[in-house]
Amino acid sequence: MGGKGGKGGKGLGKVGAKKRHSRRVIRENIQGITKPAIRRLARRGGVK
């Protein structure tokens, strides 16, 4: 039953560091999140 817990968190440091003073852009990004994007984010967080 040996198994290592694999959490993928490699290049997550730079995410969201660029847009600091643009709330409208962030809002558009939230609205623009589609299923593939959600899948990608989930995969990054270690969710299948």
From Swiss-Prot:
Segments carrying the region annotation (Disordered) are: 1-23
Coiled-coil regions listed = none
Q: Where is the composition biased (Gly residues)?
A: 1-14
- Its principal location? nucleus
State the source organism's domain of life: Eukaryota
Transmembrane portions of the chain: none
Q: Where in the cell is it found?
A: Nucleus; Chromosome
Any single GO molecular-function term of the entry would be: structural constituent of chromatin
State the protein's purpose: Core component of nucleosome. Nucleosomes wrap and compact DNA into chromatin, limiting DNA accessibility to the cellular machineries which require DNA as a template. Histones thereby play a central role in transcription regulation, DNA repair, DNA replication and chromosomal stability. DNA accessibility is regulated via a complex set of post-translational modifications of histones, also called histone code, and nucleosome remodeling.
| Similarity comment: family membership | Belongs to the histone H4 family.
Q: What is this protein called?
A: Histone H4
Query: What is the originating organism of this protein?
Result: Blepharisma japonicum
